[in-house]
Amino acid sequence: MKVKFKNSDLFKGNYKKFKLAALDIDGTLINSHHIITSRTKNAIKKAKDAGIKVTISTGRHYRSALSRAKEINIDAPLICSDGALIKDFSTNSAIYHSLSKEIAADIMKTASQYDDFKIQIFTEERKINIGSSYRSKYFKRFLREPLKHSPIGYFNLMRDFAFIPVTNVKNVDEAIKAMEEEPLKVVVYGNERQEDLKLFIEEITKKYKDEISITSAIDNCIDILRGGVSKAKGLAVVSEKLGLNREEIIAVGDNINDIKMIEYAGLGVAMGNAPERVKSKADYVTADNDSEGLAIFFEKLLAGEIQIKETLPQTKFCQSER
């Protein structure tokens, strides 16, 4: 059972109870320029020096997550693809929570019947795109958005994508042939009629019920995983491997796919840029990712200044580092 703390509770001098911190990447670890600031890196290092192991828990593909994991020198197993893959670098081993090829194939066929949906399949080593990478009008807009607000951010996002080997195929049948192993997840970008994605979700949920899990980290886009798989599931696997209980874990995130992880951890932290649905599940709300909220959280934690259900004031984007 998750421990909930009263508003008056402080962690003064008690940060040592926490042995692991699991960090989301997008909207949490990185800012809108897709940069991990020096302040954030320093705060993470100090947390590690204080005895808190640090890992990443992300919806990203393993290859994209790996570069960020190396950047902050994680010292616990890496959780990626929303908990569908856990990589332990200390033992060079992996744990998979894969979809069956049959279910993935049927989901892809169903999605392909909707106009202008973009479909991707994540396996451990690659990403498979059905149709042109830029076929979906919505997906084009999704890629253009970072360019509009931050050319540097767009460049860094594309650099992260470049780490992932990509196979482009024409249709679902070719995608099935291209899958050398069972898929970790199917990603579906909806079209400009958001009700179509809702209908698609209803259709596959009715058919597969508990055999699949559906989550989201991007507007009008869903990740379809094996039933029961989530970042929380991945975090439970990691905590068991490390011999930790839930009360010894910190989880920090900003989006819908972080909710279960935030609820699972002894100390669940929401970023200031998170929607209210996420903040309401957190024990603590820090500043937003463009105000170095993750760094601020660790600094306050180590200083014994964390008060549960405290919400830090949000500020405009920190221009000090790009």
Predicted region positions:
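Conserved ATPase-coupling elements of RecA-like P-loop NTPase cores
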Residues: 32-36
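Active-site phosphate-binding/coordination module
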Residues: 38-152
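Mg2+-dependent phosphoryl-transfer enzymes with acidic/Ser/Thr/Gly-rich catalytic loops
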Residues: 2-4, 11-20, 24, 37, ...
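Conserved acidic, metal-coordinating active-site core of Asp-based
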Residues: 117, 122-250
